[in-house]
């Protein structure tokens, strides 16, 4: 009987440790997959000729120009966006393969590299960041405002889970074909889903806004983190300054906390067992 109890206790420890490790391991695997996706994307881009790339950028710029003066913009998480994948003309823009990926976003502050896909259907948002149709494609330029949306709290990926940690002054990068565009956060808003005024194009401005649901797991509002275009070299300097600050990754904190919790549980069980044995000896 004692042997069975020990086996069950061991299984319990293993299950508890697995639950603690799951988010850490899951996020690590997701980050590795994202890095692989980015590498594969750049490999595909390397096969494009200069003429092909220039033509793709020109098509994207023409699309962006056609959006100037457009009316209202839909909520990125609206069910109406499910049909966006049926627009063949839109899906051909910046297309280099059949994945639907138009580029990727690198957010150093959040330690994530995420693929950016056409549209904001649920299928897209389960695997990466979605570009909101009828907003500018992320190729830079005056009078452009790209809107990129991502989920929070997915079991198998962070995506925009930590977007609330972004602060004014932080930088992020958009990689499209051979171009890298740098943006610095200049505005953070929390709005109702129907309030999309802050996503409109502003004459002469070059913006990218990152959108997710908030509060976490409640999702009644939208968190809008807007970045304005800055020179790449300037963004690199900001990154270097931030890099000098000593920060401990959240996953490491979670892992250490989990191990400490298990040790405390183990010590408590051992202490309880000793007291029980001692009491038994005294009674005898």
What residues fall within each predicted segment?
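Solvent-exposed, non-transmembrane regions of membrane-associated and secreted proteins
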Residues: 2-248
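C-terminal single-pass membrane-anchor helix
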Residues: 239-284
């Amino acid at each position: 009987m004692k042997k069975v109890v020990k086996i069950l206790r061991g299984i319990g420890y293993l299950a508890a440790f697995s639950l603690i490790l799951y988010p850490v391991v899951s996020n690590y695997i997701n980050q590795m997959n994202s890095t692989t996706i980015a590498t594969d994307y750049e490999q595909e881009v390397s096969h494009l000729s200069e003429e092909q790339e220039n033509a793709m950028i020109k098509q994207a710029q023409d699309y962006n120009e056609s959006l100037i003066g457009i009316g209202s913009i839909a909520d990125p998480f609206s069910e109406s966006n499910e049909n966006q994948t049926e627009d063949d003309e839109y899906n051909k823009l910046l297309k280099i393969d059949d994945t639907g990926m138009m580029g990727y976003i690198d957010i150093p502050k959040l330690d994530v590299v995420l693929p950016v896909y056409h549209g904001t259907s649920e299928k897209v948002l389960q695997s990466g960041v979605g570009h909101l149709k009828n907003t500018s494609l992320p190729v830079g330029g005056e009078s452009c405002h790209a809107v990129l949306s991502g989920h929070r709290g997915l079991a198998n990926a962070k995506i925009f889970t930590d977007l609330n940690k972004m602060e004014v002054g932080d930088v992020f990068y958009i990689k499209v074909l051979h171009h890298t565009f740098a943006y610095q956060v200049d505005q953070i808003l929390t709005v109702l889903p129907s309030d999309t005024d802050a996503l409109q194009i502003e004459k002469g401005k070059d913006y990218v806004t990152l959108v997710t649901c908030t509060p976490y797991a409640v999702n009644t509002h939208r968190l809008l983190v807007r970045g304005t275009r800055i020179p790449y070299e300037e963004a690199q300097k900001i990154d270097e300054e931030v890099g000098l600050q000593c920060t401990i990754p959240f996953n490491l904190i979670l892992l250490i906390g989990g191990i400490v919790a298990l040790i405390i549980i183990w010590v408590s069980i051992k202490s309880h067992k000793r007291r029980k044995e001692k009491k038994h000896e005294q009674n005898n």
